[in-house]
A protein has these predicted regions:
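Conserved, single-site charged/polar hotspot
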Residues: 1-281
Length: 281
């Protein structure tokens, strides 16, 4: 059973910080949206390959210091994974920290620094998840997600009027015409934790990553690892990765598998210090 928390707070009417867990589906452990892990149901996920993998690993559990791991995952980390506590409640899981998604450590610098994050987001490092191999992607993405051509690095633009209306509709806060979007705090992967939105009616800092992604997209922005450029009344978001970036990178893991890494090596790559143990037959 998945148990979680929900938090929403305002600080002197200057901040709106929220993270999500189970409040939107109290009668179910998971839902089929970015809110959870986009669980698509047993009818879509339970293929012969999945059955084979389940049987081969029956009774195996990923643990950290004797405790079962909270083994989070996202579609594409963009080359670097994020800390759990930067995304959800302020709980530190040592195995859910930053790693670079490559055979050898990538030199990223401190991605909490704005100029370093900008350089990283605009680059195309040789990460496992930097792939366009359709066969590999078909193992991870369902049919409609495969229509997405650019997810390792991506771009989306909005006129100021359209963006202002979108933000109001998606999070219910009327900024008026949005004049500026400023990064306030980034996590270790470069993902934004807090963003300051300045409009002609209101200025407010919002967070965490999911509310940021929700605010700037009809569904969810690919990730909160982005920079914003404004020119001639157009806001352009340049971003990295797809999803919250915590834990296992699904596309990176698929590439690792295609290159001959076994599942134990893949888990050790994404969940540092964890151990697979056999709990039952």
């Amino acid at each position: 059973t998945v148990r979680g928390t929900y938090s929403s707070c305002r600080v002197d009417q200057e901040e709106y910080i929220r993270w999500y867990d189970r409040e939107d589906h109290a009668h179910f452990d998971v839902c089929a949206d970015d809110h959870c892990q986009r669980y698509q149901g047993i009818s879509k996920a339970y293929t012969p390959a999945v059955r084979e993998a389940l049987e081969a690993t029956r009774g195996e559990v990923l643990t950290y210091e004797g405790t079962i791991c909270d083994a989070r995952f996202s579609k594409c980390c963009g080359g670097a994974t994020e800390r759990f506590d930067n995304t959800w409640e302020p709980v530190v899981h040592p195995y859910l920290d930053k790693i670079t998604d490559a055979p050898e450590d990538l030199e990223t610098g401190d991605l909490r620094d704005e100029q370093t994050a900008r350089k990283w987001i605009l680059s195309f490092p040789p990460a496992f998840c930097h792939t366009t191999d359709r066969q590999i992607l078909s193992q991870v993405l369902n049919d409609y997600d495969q229509e997405t051509q650019h997810f390792f690095r991506w771009q989306v633009s909005y006129p100021a009027e359209q963006l202002s209306e979108l933000v109001y509709r998606k999070i219910g806060i009327d900024f008026g015409t949005i004049r500026d979007i400023q990064p306030i705090e980034r996590g270790v992967s470069g993902r934004l934790i807090r963003v300051k939105i300045t409009g002609d009616k209101k200025t407010l800092v919002i967070g965490k990553e999911l509310i940021i992604r929700k605010a700037f997209s009809e569904s969810h922005l690919y990730s909160s690892a982005f920079i914003v450029e404004k020119q001639d009344g157009i806001f352009t978001f340049h971003g990295a990765g797809w999803g919250h970036g915590v834990g296992l990178c699904q596309i990176g893991a698929a590439v690792m598998g295609a290159r001959g890494y076994n599942y134990k090596a893949i888990l050790q790559h994404y969940f540092k210090g964890c151990e697979l143990i056999k709990m039952y037959e």
